[in-house]
Amino acid sequence: MTEPEITPELIAAHGLKPDEYQRILEIIGRAPTFTELGIFSAMWNEHCSYKSSKKWLRTLPTTGPQVICGPGENAGVVDIGDGQAVIFKMESHNHPSYIEPYQGAATGVGGILRDVFTMGARPIAAMNALSFGEPSHPKTAHIVKGVVEGIGGYGNAFGVPTVGGEVRFHRAYNGNCLVNAFAAGLADADRIFYSAASGVGMPVVYLGAKTGRDGVGGATMASAEFDDTIEEKRPTVQVGDPFTEKRLLEACLELMASDSVISIQDMGAAGLTCSAVEMGDKGDLGIRLQLDAVPQREANMTAYEMMLSESQERMLMVLKPEKEAVARAIFEKWDLDFAIVGETIPEDRFLILHGNEVKADLPLKALSGTAPEYDRPWIETPAAAPLGAVPEVDPIEGLKALIGSPSYAHKAWVWEQYDSQVMADTVRAPGLGAGVVRVHGTPKALAFTSDVTPRYVKANPFEGGKQAVAEAYRNLTAVGARPLATTDNMNFGNPEKPEIMGQFVGAIEGIGAAVAALDMPIVSGNVSLYNETDGVGILPTPTIGAVGLLTSLDELIAGEPQAGDLALVIGTTAGHLGQSALLAEMFGREEGDAPPVDLEAEKRHGEFLRANRKLVRAAADLSDGGLALAAFEMAEAAGLGLTLTPSGTAALFGEDQARYLVACAPDRAEALQAAAEAAGVPLQEVGRFGGAAVTLAGASAPLADLSRLYRRAFAEAIGG
């Protein structure tokens, strides 16, 4: 088949800038072949190379005594004691999910699960953080339903519990939804599998499903803005099969137990190209591939298509040669393809053969380690104008504005489509703060949360970045867990715009300050840029996924109070209404500065709660919606009314940080107050749980009426 001529138009269609193409010519000393152009395009795009963000990502704290492996591998690895490790990561599948919601979201789940089990871990938990356009937008309902169905369809069939996440709506996501998928797994700390190839002449083996044309160019598509050609990009979305993925998991874990694996890498973005280059680059080796050996499910596939296909449920492995028969038998047993498609070579070459032709012969290091890296111009986000006057509101009407909004309404419509109990180790399912999963066969448990408040980040990227980490810290602490580490999913607009790059830089600096202060190093992550449609960008959304440890389930703090329990707030309430949920939902105002985050107070208050967990019956962090929303959610989950005594809009709905709401039996309140005084931690009694009404500063409504609104608003908003 004749390959197309390399023209400026073809170069631009591959997402390469003229100066980048000139650099390619200088590196290889000639014009590239069509396949080589595709390989450079895939490896040098934002999705694979992080060329606009690498400079700043390097500044993040990534080490600590608990960290076994930080960023750079498929997922982060953290020690949880007793010879065990938790392996986790969060990454985006934003562009594919907007184009084809079901498959985009489903393959996002599949990809993050492979990142975890390719390192030798059995997945035990999943989460997802979803951002959609306003419910009235004509595309939103279709996207929401497709994304949720795709996540549930893949995760449920694979057999991993979905234990948490978040869902928000905002007009800034009308043209770009965000689908951030998280997965965590367990492995023996001394049986972690890495991706660096080693040894010359070692067989490179293709594992899993066959290669088709789905997803060709997916990584390049994910590194560009959308415009009116969006429908033409539908073929770049991958198609997933969770049952094949489940077989691939079992085959890989069995293979790993057979001492056959030198290195292993899943085929994700840019497929065979990226997995082979990463393995060779990390091992300082070259790779030779013979594409005639690649299992194909479609006829007449070209070298270009095979190298750039993003067909799902595939792995690439460097195998111990003497173990070929053992490895082949395992994959045949699981009815999966096993094919030797190449070998490691000593030269710094990426050599691609197809038929009797050399389709690509490139310096491998130039594709990865020496890919372009930019120091993009950026400008600091201007300080927000001071918040103007906020009228006093009827507290019940303020609460109704929040619980009647799909962003804050009960999310049962979403969670009920996810299996949260498969594997029978889920202790806390979605809906009550952080998810909690038992570490099977031990007294331990792990807690999981994902958090960010994009309004804050837009108003003040530094404080917004800090707050995302601080809220994750509080959510883990509120279930009794000790926060261990984090993964970041950085979703931003076009980095070539200095104001957008400034948001990114500010958020990174805030995240870095918070993870350092709270001992929650970043161990993995993902960057998704160019989340814009026709030049309109999303809210800056640096999602933080976090994991915490309970050494025993005796440390678990419940989420539901009992009738008669006192409501107390740990922390200081100043009544910060800037960028608050109440302001946005009741008045349509996104004004003022984000609330400041005192990291020392965050740590001190969190440590106080964990140290005094035996004195409280239930706990929740205070964030969006302030005291009123958190207290309502806690009471409603238990089927209880409540009475809050603080008066004034700011006291009830302010979003001051470093605060927790706790429910405490009356006979333990005195001991808790004494402990707070001894620790120098502010503690204020604010009300009581019980009854059949919700009373806020004297205004009252039946719990049943509010609960009905709270539990119906989400489905009604999207026509569910």
Swiss-Prot record:
Residues at the catalytic site: H47, H93
Binding-site residues, Mg(2+) 1: E91, N526
Alphabetized UniProt keyword annotations: ATP-binding, Cytoplasm, Ligase, Magnesium, Metal-binding, Nucleotide-binding, Purine biosynthesis
Entry annotated with the keyword Acyltransferase: no
Protein residues bound to ATP: Y50, K89, D488, G525
Residues where substrate binds: S92, H93, N94, H95, R114, Q238, E310, S311, Q312, S528
Binding site for Mg(2+) 2: D115, D266
UniProt catalytic activity: N(2)-formyl-N(1)-(5-phospho-beta-D-ribosyl)glycinamide + L-glutamine + ATP + H2O = 2-formamido-N(1)-(5-O-phospho-beta-D-ribosyl)acetamidine + L-glutamate + ADP + phosphate + H(+)
Any GO molecular function: magnesium ion binding
Compartments, record wording: Cytoplasm
GO biological process: 'de novo' IMP biosynthetic process
Pfam families per the UniProt record, alphabetical: AIRS, AIRS_C, FGAR-AT_linker
Enzyme class: ligase
The keyword Metal-binding appears for this protein: yes
Record pathway: Purine metabolism; IMP biosynthesis via de novo pathway; 5-amino-1-(5-phospho-D-ribosyl)imidazole from N(2)-formyl-N(1)-(5-phospho-D-ribosyl)glycinamide: step 1/2
SUPFAM superfamilies tied to this protein: PurM C-terminal domain-like (SSF56042), PurM N-terminal domain-like (SSF55326)
Enzyme Commission number(s): 6.3.5.3
Single GO cellular component term: cytoplasm
Subunit organization: Monomer. Part of the FGAM synthase complex composed of 1 PurL, 1 PurQ and 2 PurS subunits.
Family: Belongs to the FGAMS family.
UniProt xrefs under HAMAP family: PurL_2
UniProt function note: Part of the phosphoribosylformylglycinamidine synthase complex involved in the purines biosynthetic pathway. Catalyzes the ATP-dependent conversion of formylglycinamide ribonucleotide (FGAR) and glutamine to yield formylglycinamidine ribonucleotide (FGAM) and glutamate. The FGAM synthase complex is composed of three subunits. PurQ produces an ammonia molecule by converting glutamine to glutamate. PurL transfers the ammonia molecule to FGAR to form FGAM in an ATP-dependent manner.
Protein name as annotated: Phosphoribosylformylglycinamidine synthase subunit PurL
